Design a protein with these regions (language model features):
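Local sequence-structure signature of Cys/Sec-based thiol-disulfide redox active-site neighborhoods
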Residues: 1-37
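Short, aromatic/basic amphipathic alpha-helical patches
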Residues: 17-24, 51-58, 92
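Thioredoxin-like thiol-disulfide oxidoreductase module
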Residues: 36-68
Length: 96
């Protein structure tokens, strides 16, 4: 399974998040997406999904909520961001 913590496109265009999803869809793995933001009626137009961010923080063993997105796990193992996924796809799965 590929799990991706990401910024939703309807809130902010995140090229790396979009590309990570595209790469994941090119595999035969099941994909699970975790949005770290949600649309809100506040002045910003969004709010953070703190429960999702705190889950990510715990999974990677970080004491901070600040991350570069996307953050990706393959079969429960944290591999990092888009560049790590691209490297994994090329080296392990043999395509890119």
């Amino acid at each position: 399974m590929i799990e991706i913590y990401y910024i939703p496109e309807e809130i902010r265009k995140c090229y790396s998040c979009v590309r990570a999803k595209e790469l994941a869809q090119e595999t035969t793995h099941e994909i699970k997406m975790y949005p770290i933001m949600k649309i809100s009626d506040n002045d910003l137009g969004f709010e953070y999904n703190l429960d999702v961010i705190d889950e990510l923080k715990e999974r990677v063993g970080s004491s901070r909520r600040a991350f570069i997105y996307p953050q990706i796990f393959i079969d429960g193992i944290h591999i990092g961001s888009l560049s790590a996924l691209q490297q994994h796809v090329e080296e392990v799965w043999g395509f890119f």
